[in-house]
């Protein structure tokens, strides 16, 4: 009887603690003034990467912005290290003249193409084993494959199996979390400027 009562008491404390934290966060945000409108817009920023989310492309594959079409994770949205299918909404113009050794390859990805990408930065906090959390200011991906049109085969006549561990670009800009190592994305880690 005493153990059942103790477990119910601990559950009640954890629920009450979470409620108090949410309420204090609500009071702090309202007392500081509304920066970008309502509290709901701030809460929306911390959700999964789902269909319709605009992501920044942080490699040099000529894509600037990609809109998520589908998460290959399943019903839930994508998190750090997950693979998504996206449509390129904005792309860099193709560089015609060669200026030294530029970071931008000649037009691998164009606007309107459907690409596969690995989520390398997410605005939603992700807990780590040591108790800390990693959270980024933006949602970003690295392009790892370009979806071919239906019926398009490679030179051998058989359909090519898509490899999701080789990035299309040759550089990755900005920080990348070390959780990519657990997702077997070692090539992205080796190309990254900073590992967090």
Curated annotation (Swiss-Prot):
Q: Which UniProt keywords apply?
A: Mitochondrion, Ribonucleoprotein, Ribosomal protein, RNA-binding, rRNA-binding, Transit peptide
The protein depicted here goes by the name Large ribosomal subunit protein uL14my
Provide the residue span(s) of the region labelled Disordered.
Answer: 148-175
Q: Where in the cell is it found?
A: Mitochondrion
Q: Which gene encodes it?
A: HLL
Q: Which HAMAP family match?
A: Ribosomal_uL14
SUPFAM superfamilies, per the entry: Ribosomal protein L14 (SSF50193)
Residues in coiled coil: none
Look up keyword Ligase and say if it applies: no
**GO cellular component terms given for this protein:** mitochondrion; ribonucleoprotein complex; ribosome
What organism does the UniProt record list as the source? Arabidopsis thaliana (Mouse-ear cress)
Q: Its induction, per UniProt?
A: By brassinosteroid (BR), repressed by the BR biosynthesis inhibitor brassinazole (BRZ).
Q: What does this protein do?
A: Binds to 23S rRNA in mitochondrion. Required for the formation of the proximal region of the ovule primordium during floral organogenesis, thus participating in patterning and growth of ovule. Also regulates the initiation and/or maintenance of integument and embryo sac ontogenesis. Prevents inappropriate cell death in the young ovule.
